[in-house]
A protein has these predicted regions:
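A general structural signal for well-ordered alpha-helical segments in protein cores
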Residues: 6, 19, 23, 62, ...
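Short helix-capping segments at alpha-helix termini
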Residues: 28-35, 104-105, 138
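Short beta-strand elements in bilobed, periplasmic/extracellular small-molecule ligand-binding domains
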Residues: 34-43, 47, 140-149
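Helix-loop-strand module that forms the ligand-binding subsite of alpha/beta enzymes
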Residues: 57-137
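N-terminal beta1-alpha1 ligand-phosphate binding loop
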Residues: 2-34
């Protein structure tokens, strides 16, 4: 049976971050036929440097990231917002995925960004930045997925059925864009 693979790029390195918990919820509650894989090791990536992005010399964590994203059908960034923008770890991952020039692992893949953070706008600017960077890297950004959730004055947003329903709806939308992009057999 074939399935749709969605890889998740996490913008937070904290083991118990709300954004990791969102990713785990999507992984655990993904509908039949959809596999959600959380990419681990983004913190191990060196900062992008064209001088080490040379065939045969690419660092192992970078090769693994490119292979995992390249084999996926869709990409979902789940991220907080740091100082009004996306975290450096996510920006760096997108930088590595965008290269080598003309061979981006993100090229043509449906991409969305969402998440939660304890700010008034819930990470909106971070998500906009991630979508813009992914677009430049060649991804097909799914514009109708926009969940930037504020956690201010909310004890556990993952205990809110309405919020989890919105997350699962976003996953379905992302997967449907991937299916539309597949050529007819």
């Amino acid at each position: 049976m074939s399935h749709t693979r969605v890889v998740v790029l996490l913008g937070s390195l904290r083991s118990q971050s709300i954004n990791r918990r969102i990713a785990e919820t999507l992984r655990d509650q993904a509908p039949a036929g959809t596999v959600v894989e959380i990419v681990d090791g983004l913190g191990e990536l060196p900062f992008y440097n064209e001088e080490i992005d040379v065939e045969g010399e690419v660092p192992g964590p970078v090769s693994r990231l490119r292979a995992q994203v390249g084999a996926a059908d869709s990409v979902l960034a789940i991220t907080p917002e740091y100082n009004g923008t996306m975290p450096a770890v996510l920006n760096n991952a997108i930088d590595w995925l965008s290269r080598p020039y003309g061979a981006s692992a993100l090229s043509g893949k449906p991409f969305a960004a969402l998440g939660a953070t304890p700010t008034r706008f819930g990470g909106k600017w971070s998500h906009e930045d991630a979508r813009r960077s992914a677009t430049v890297a060649g991804a097909h950004v799914v514009a109708d997925i926009a969940i930037s959730e504020s956690t201010i004055d909310r004890e556990d947003i993952l205990a809110e059925p309405e919020f989890v329903g919105r997350l699962l709806g976003a996953l379905d939308t992302l997967v449907s864009h991937q299916v539309e992009a597949k050529p007819a057999a």
